[in-house]
Amino acid sequence: MNINLDPDLAAIVAQAKSANPNPPHPADIPLEVFRAGYVMQGRLQATQGLHCDTVYDTSIESDACVVPVRVYRAKGSQAAAPGLIFIHGGGFTIGNLDLHDSLCRQLAIEAAVTVIALDYRLAPEHKFPAAVEDCLAATRWILANAAALQLQANTIAIGGDSAG
């Protein structure tokens, strides 16, 4: 199959291929190295110009765990805003709150919602289904405490990328 790329993008792809013509398969990269690369990618996403009225870190406690979360409220948000529970991607093995900070800010601003990003426990340090259990526990807590979080209880969505 032949794909016609934009000339600027084609130049970037050609440069990347020439720099490393035989990249390793992701399964062959040690997890620590893979995680470090993922973190570096996240740092390339600037948050300049994406100013939410409120951004704070807290945690949600359940019977089984403590789930770190980050809450984003856009400027001018209504007293009780719609909510988005954001679950980051990374195959339940990589990722954290910082990697999707820019995206969560953008979602809060452009969709006029309060975003609550979850930072679940990662495998293989925590056996499956620990990450899923973290997300379920945090979601249940958020739904039960919507008023305290200034959320409209009937307008809370769940989203994310990849594993999220």
Regions found by a protein language model. Name each.
Residues 69, 85, 107, 118, ...:
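Short strand-loop-helix active-site module centered on a catalytic nucleophile
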Residues 98-118:
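Short amphipathic alpha-helix adjacent to the substrate-entry channel of hydrolases
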Residues 119-123:
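Short beta-to-alpha linker loops that shape the active-site pocket of alpha/beta-hydrolase fold enzymes
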Residues 65-67, 74-84:
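Proline/glycine-enriched tight loop/beta-turn segments at coil->beta junctions
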Residues 81, 88-93:
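Active-site glycine-rich loops that stabilize anionic/oxyanionic intermediates
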Residues 96-98, 126-128:
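Conserved catalytic-core motifs of eukaryotic protein kinase domains, centered on the activation segment
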Residues 1-71:
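A glycine/proline-hinged amphipathic helix-loop "lid/cap" segment
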Residues 40, 113, 151:
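Short glycine/serine/threonine/alanine-rich loop segments
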